[in-house]
A protein has these predicted regions:
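Acidic donor-binding loop of glycosyltransferase active sites
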Residues: 292-302, 315-316
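Conserved donor-binding/catalytic core segment of Leloir-type glycosyltransferases
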Residues: 4, 162, 214-230, 236-239, ...
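Carbohydrate-associated surface elements
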Residues: 38, 167, 189
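Short, structured helix-loop element that forms part of the nucleotide-activated donor/catalytic region
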Residues: 45-50, 54, 58, 206, ...
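A charged, aromatic-enriched C-terminal amphipathic alpha-helix characteristic of glycosyltransferases
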Residues: 358-391
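N-terminal subdomain of nucleotide-sugar transferases
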Residues: 1-53, 60-62, 240, 381, ...
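Glycosyltransferase donor-sugar binding loop
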Residues: 40, 190, 223, 248-264, ...
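Membrane-proximal helix-turn-helix segments that form the acceptor-binding/catalytic region
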Residues: 107, 129, 141-161, 175
Length: 400
């Protein structure tokens, strides 16, 4: 099958949903083209620092063609579309168009689907009340009028809309008036193939030895973009309180320039504590090595793909729900301890870490539960079939 994906940002060194879709579509024999903007740096992307001088280019990643286009308009970094893709769609001749979020190039996709009845189109959706529509103007105008205008025209031609979390479906239903019947949650999966390969090769054991951790040390993984919303300072304080346990905390990730002060705050909190290590921003394979080494993952707040990656690596999770980021749909095997907003505190984190790390039987059961959840809900070998099923023709029945 020929698949064209539209996304605003693509960087081959990361493990975002787009990267994993590329990997697993190609693995299963599909031909993939990704259309994205000319953004290169994830930090520039999240701080809206777009350099319009960067030229368009085409290259290949994991067997997929990546086409990076300039924006033809970019209004306050909120409404932007890259140069028209009518001709590109005709050249690529996709069987499936996969749109990531409400892209303002949707009109070209709609026109293509209208002209090519065999082509299907699906869209995933990453926004919810926790990360979007934080002001009345944004909620009522940006989402409720402008983006809704584009989505309303696309909906008759979308085989399915895939919110990545249940809260996204609520947001679409309440703000965009999308019926629940048009949606189904498609979780952000993880690279289960890579996680299994790391385990098979013993990468975690090797890294554990390289970092000088003892066999009976309990290694805690945390990380992501180092920002105040992550509340990493609470975890550092909790680990400091649990000196009676043999804990080692590994912090993966980096801060943007705007949040360098927060990183400095974390470094000051960890100063003199040899059991707290900052290892910086890592590529995806190195992230999975760290996960394979760890015994437990703790994320005080602000959900990221690392949560799914940790489950894929078979780790018990302790995490905080700051609101509209309920992860209970991935807690089918009691593999996650979820702290509600009013309990995201140093003392509660310390209490739950001790309750899990201090009970080997419970930690083992949570690990086994995480492995089952990963196989059932986070394996892209299975998840991609949910996006492709609309192209499978119904069986024909011969009356004779």
């Amino acid at each position: 099958m020929k698949i064209v994906m539209l996304c605003d940002f693509y960087n081959e060194s990361l493990e975002y949903q787009e990267n994993l879709l590329v990997k697993y579509y190609v693995k299963h024999g599909h031909e993939v083209t990704v259309i994205a903007s000319t953004f290169e740096s994830v930090f520039d992307y999240y701080t809206d620092r777009h350099d319009k001088r960067v030229p368009p280019r085409t290259y290949f990643d994991q067997g997929a063609k990546i086409v990076k286009l300039r924006y033809r308009y970019n209004l306050m970094n909120r409404l932007r579309a890259y140069t028209r893709i009518d001709r590109l769609l005709e050249e690529e001749a996709p069987d499936l168009i996969y749109v990531h979020d409400i892209m303002l190039n949707l009109p070209e996709c709609i026109a293509y689907v209208k002209q090519h009845s065999q082509c299907r189109m699906v869209m995933d959706y990453h926004a919810d009340y926790s990360n979007s529509g934080r002001s009345a103007l944004s909620l009522k105008l940006l989402h409720g009028v402008v983006r809704k205008w584009f989505l309303d025209r696309a909906r008759p031609h979308l085989s399915r809309i895939f919110p990545i979390v249940p809260a996204g479906a609520t947001f679409l239903h309440e703000i965009y008036k999308v019926p629940h019947a048009e949606m189904e949650v498609l979780p952000l999966g993880a690279d289960v193939d890579l996680a299994r390969e790391m385990r098979r090769r013993g990468e975690g054991r090797r890294l554990r030895s390289q970092m000088g951790f003892a066999a009976d040390d309990i290694v805690i993984f945390t990380g992501g973009k180092l920002a105040p919303s992550k509340r990493t300072e609470l975890l550092i304080e909790a680990v400091a309180r649990l000196a009676r346990l043999r804990l080692q905390l590994v912090v993966v990730g980096e801060a943007s320039e705007a949040e360098a002060g927060y990183k400095q705050q974390l470094l000051e909190l960890a100063k003199g504590r040899t059991n707290i290590r900052f290892v910086g921003w890592l590529g995806r394979e190195d992230v999975y090595r760290q996960l394979d080494m760890a015994d437990l993952a703790v994320f005080p707040a602000s959900q990221s793909i690392l949560w799914q990656q940790a489950i894929a690596a078979g780790l018990p999770l302790i995490c905080g729900d700051t609101g509209h980021q309920d992860i209970s749909y991935l807690n089918a095997e009691s593999n996650i301890v979820i702290l509600p907003r009013n309990e995201i505190r140093t003392d509660r984190l310390a209490q739950e870490i001790e309750a899990v790390a201090g009970q080997p039987e419970r930690m083992h059961a949570m690990r086994e539960g995480a492995a089952r959840v990963a196989a059932e809900h986070l394996d892209w070998n299975r998840l991609i079939e949910r996006t492709l099923r609309f192209n499978i023709p119904p069986p024909s029945f011969d009356d004779n």
